[in-house]
Regions:
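Conserved alpha/beta-hydrolase "acid-adjacent" motif
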Residues: 185-191
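Gly/Ala-rich beta-loop-alpha elbow adjacent to hydrolase catalytic centers
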Residues: 61-70
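Flexible "cap/lid" loop of the alpha/beta hydrolase fold
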Residues: 79-111, 150-155
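Conserved alpha/beta-hydrolase catalytic His-Asp/Glu region
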Residues: 114-161
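The conserved beta1-alpha1 loop
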Residues: 7-9, 63, 180-181, 213
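Conserved HGGG/HGGXW glycine-rich cap/lid loop of the alpha/beta-hydrolase fold
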Residues: 1-43
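Short beta-strand/loop motif that positions the catalytic acidic residue
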Residues: 172, 177-180, 184
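Catalytic histidine-centered segment of alpha/beta-hydrolase-like enzymes
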Residues: 186, 212-227
């Protein structure tokens, strides 16, 4: 049995994955989306389906902060973890740290002052650059702005830049696929590299690195199924 559980990042929802899941479903993958609930009071956390299959694949797709939102139990039991523009510590150690922190504090202020909509629109727009927002998410995003869960947006934004130790719960022999966009305007390159370096040093099996040209923090206009299928068969 081939299973996928996804976790979107901050300011997004499960519809972020809709364009990608089509090819997986066509190829007999069982797909479940976690929903954090930024645009409503509804949230959902999927669980692995028990299977006796000897060729079991349990793959998590984590985008950005989604790695920290995904329950540890799900990650522990995964055979494959796909990290898409993910991080352990969002803030870099270099002198860019204070500049990025000030930007995050301005975003917090917008939420506190009850002005989150324009801020979130700008964040999502920059997240998809140099591409456009994917159509499935775009339709839902603009409709859902009226029902924003501002309390959750704010508390998760504060969590996003907390300093963290290395995630020791990861299995040493876990197969990790580390996807890194080359035009990411949200996640600093240093933060991404630091996470990859830590994984390389700590795990028995080095992560498989995939660099994507012409992609931003949020992926669009690519066939994620083919990219991952090639790595699974490698």
């Amino acid at each position: 049995m081939k299973q996928i559980i996804t976790q979107h990042g901050w300011g997004l929802n499960k519809y972020f994955w809709d364009d990608y899941k089509v090819d997986f479903l066509k190829n007999n993958w069982h797909w479940q989306d976690n929903e954090r609930g930024y645009f409503s009071t509804n949230n959902y956390q999927a669980k692995w389906i028990k299977s006796e299959s000897k060729k079991e694949i349990r793959m998590t797709l984590c985008h950005s902060f989604g790695f920290h939102l995904m329950p540890k139990k799900i990650l522990k039991e995964a055979t494959h973890i796909v990290l898409i523009n993910s991080f352990n510590n969002f803030l870099p150690l270099s002198n860019k740290r204070n500049f990025i922190l000030r930007s995050l504090k301005r975003m917090e202020t917008k939420i506190i002052k009850d002005e989150p909509k324009d801020m979130l629109k700008e964040f999502i727009y920059r997240s998809f650059m140099p591409n456009h927002m994917n159509n499935s998410f775009k339709k839902i995003f603009y409709k859902s702005l009226e029902s924003l869960n501002k309390t959750l947006l704010l508390s998760d934004l504060k969590e996003l830049y907390m300093n963290r130790d290395f995630p020791v719960f990861l299995k040493k022999d876990c197969k990790i696929i580390f996807i890194k966009s080359e035009n990411d305007l949200i996640l600093d390159n240093e933060s991404s590299n630091n996470f990859l370096d830590s994984l390389n040093k700590t795990l028995d099996r080095e992560p498989t690195l995939i660099k994507l040209a012409q992609q931003g923090h949020c992926l669009n206009n690519l066939n994620l199924y083919e990219i991952l299928r090639n790595k699974l068969n490698a």
